[in-house]
Amino acid sequence: MSEPQNGRGALFTGGLAAILASACCLGPLVLIALGFSGAWIGNLTVLEPYRPIFIGVALVALFFAWRRIYRPSAACKPGEVCAIPQVPATYKLIFWGVAVLVLVALGFPYVVPFFY
């Protein structure tokens, strides 16, 4: 018996891709703020050429998560997870939380020059 798809995988993929997209700029600032230092922090810039790919993956994953969460679904049978009223509301809350974090992560490289 397989578990129904509910958008969790797309939310996870979108969040991970956004983190990877901003790793070249956000990573060094976070590490320095935590007290880490060293020349190896500069190696995180090796991810910069892949940033557009990660941005695309994040946005596509968020689109599929949005589609899965907000598209009308088939009727739920009693006893299934989707029949519990709090579950769809929780998924929507998590989706918008991840969407905000993705937008922050995607916009951070443009704001980071003001911190250095």
UniProtKB/Swiss-Prot annotation:
It comes from the Bacteria. This is Mercuric transport protein MerT. Involved in mercury resistance. Probably transfers a mercuric ion from the periplasmic Hg(2+)-binding protein MerP to the cytoplasmic mercuric reductase MerA. The gene is merT. It is found in: Cell inner membrane. GO terms for molecular function: mercury ion transmembrane transporter activity; metal ion binding. The keyword Cell cycle does not apply. Disulfide bonds: none annotated. Hg(2+) binds at residues 24-25, 76, 82. Keywords: Cell inner membrane, Cell membrane, Membrane, Mercuric resistance, Mercury, Metal-binding, Plasmid, Transmembrane, Transmembrane helix, Transport.
